[in-house]
């Protein structure tokens, strides 16, 4: 678990958020005994924002809530200076968002350089020596596994009225869905497949009967259901899996549900064959759709479990 502090240099409008997050990292490539290229990802929550308010904070057009999700990815070089100290430098990409649960939700993105000094509490002198023996890695049993995810969330909605004008919905709408994905496990770190994606989006095709936004009505449930197909790819790590998906709805009633969507998801292992699912659905790579918070089950799982020994 990590803790961070961000200075936004616009404290009256944005605040300076504090982050609390899970993190995981590993070596990508090793150039010699002291130098390596590594990655690290962070996922958690950020606190202390000053959200948009029409009277008190009208200039903040990007953040609408006091608590927001926090995503961060680092790629960096790591120099082992001594058994206790490392020097790191690289690039960090960060995203803050409330997952479309409040307006506004433009989100905030940043990219920057990373420089740090790491103190290793338990590392020993042997870290500089080349190991005399490395345990052989068993051949990976390639196979097809099946992931079933059930998720739900809530969202706000911008409704188009008049000549392209948008008004914010006065309420939040429920979202419920499932994913069923046969995944081919290529090796210890990668799996890919196709997913059948079903969703009920309570905000889909909401409309204003008078065209002025004074009243917003929901259509029949049939116009808020969709079934889609997406291609999936996942990077597998001990306890954590990061995945992406690209898909389109194939059965729907049109309108908001006629879309090309993208999915970014984190799966956190609970047992060998079950996991927590935290995902985000986008439309056309830039329009936020909804969070995907749920639970998943994996069937026909033949993945070796070294980290549980």
Identify what each model region corresponds to.
Residues 189, 193-230, 234, 239:
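Flexible internal linker/loop segments at domain or repeat junctions
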Residues 9-17, 33, 100-103, 170-173, ...:
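Solvent-exposed loop/turn segments connecting transmembrane beta-strands
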Residues 109-130, 288-309:
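Outer-membrane beta-barrel "beta-signal"
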Residues 52-62, 160-169, 203-221:
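Flexible, solvent-exposed loop segments that connect beta-strands
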Residues 3-5, 39-47, 89-95, 144-156, ...:
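Transmembrane beta-barrel strands of outer-membrane/channel proteins
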Residues 22-28, 41-45, 71-79, 91, ...:
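Residues on the lipid-exposed face of transmembrane beta-strands in outer-membrane beta-barrel proteins
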Residues 79-87, 123-126, 188-192, 237-243, ...:
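Repeated loop/turn-to-beta-strand initiation elements of outer-membrane beta-barrel proteins
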Residues 14-20, 35, 65-71, 107-113, ...:
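Residues that define the transmembrane beta-barrel architecture of outer-membrane proteins
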